[in-house]
Amino acid sequence: MSKQVVNSPLSLLGELKQRRNTYEKRGLSTGWKKADEFMSLKKGYPIMIGGYAGSGKSEVAFDIAINSSVDHDWLWLIVSPETGDQFEIMEYLIEKVAQGKHIGKKYQGALSDSEYESIVKWLHKHIRILDRQSGWDDVFTGLDFSLKNLFEVVENVEKQLKGKFDGIIIDPFNELDLNLGGNIAGTVKDELDALIRYTKKNNYLTILTNHANNRHEIQSKDENGKSFFWKPPATKEEWAFGQQFARKGYQMLFVYEPPMQFQHLQRNEGNIDFMESINNNYNVREILCQKTKPKGVGKTGKFCLHFDRQNQRYYEIDSLGMKKQIKYPKL
């Protein structure tokens, strides 16, 4: 029977009963207790991560992929031209799982060959990479790199794998082939509609990163009474193509690096996240949950993560200021 455009409640009853068996408002854990208060990993819905250049939004997306692979045994497809080609992305991931050891053999404290191969085998179980830089244009000659085309390619890849991806990272939005010569709002709307449609259709968790437009700087006083200028976080409407993102977004996160002067002011008021940050070369990021949808999946607000530069991973601290353990696979 063909699908109906208009349906009655009773015509949907059979599928509604099936959905009750697995119905959950919240998704799965992110791997960070503080983050779980505000967000969750719910399949069938996209997460959008915004931020200024260099703020660490790609790092957050990649860490979510690793945490969910460790905790939930997920399989991810990563599309990240901004990170690099397939080899650079793989080395980036290996570093994140290497627990601080160097991947280059010439360095002291480098991974052994067996450790290196064990990490690659674990990543093989959980990660696939679509290489825009040296793959797409050669394999799909003349095919625009749009979200619709991307998801159609992904569906064909799944047939070859004889399996399905749990999550897909697309990093960032501006790497798509967007026709911005005419109706820009319409073009962006069509791309986001495709993201939502295929995410729901295939029950993925998709993560789409996006840059934010620069805001006007604000003048404030530091702890010594000296003036400094700083840039506040962008609102969701101030992301690149923000009107469409704000309308179409489900879970929208903004990764923000607070200015050093602001961190000192907050530390002086007893904020333990900023104490930790200042003691670790200003490694804090505020994650602002600017929109949450569907109801129950999370809530608006903010939490803090800290970037461990040696391990190339985000961590959180507890209420006593103690560093919580980073998620690593058992190799």
Enumerate the predicted regions with their spans:
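C-terminal regions of RecA-like/P-loop NTPase motor modules
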Residues: 1-21, 53, 105, 120, ...
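The Walker A/P-loop phosphate-binding site
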Residues: 2-100, 246
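Conserved inter-motif catalytic segment of the P-loop NTP-binding fold
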Residues: 14, 72-182
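Structural motif
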Residues: 48, 166-171, 207, 253
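Structural recognition of the conserved hydrophobic beta-strand(s) that form the central parallel beta-sheet
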Residues: 78, 169-170, 204-211
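Cofactor-binding loop segments of dinucleotide-utilizing enzymes, especially the Rossmann-like FAD-
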Residues: 81, 211, 257
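A short alpha/beta connector and helix-capping loop motif
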Residues: 182-196, 205-206
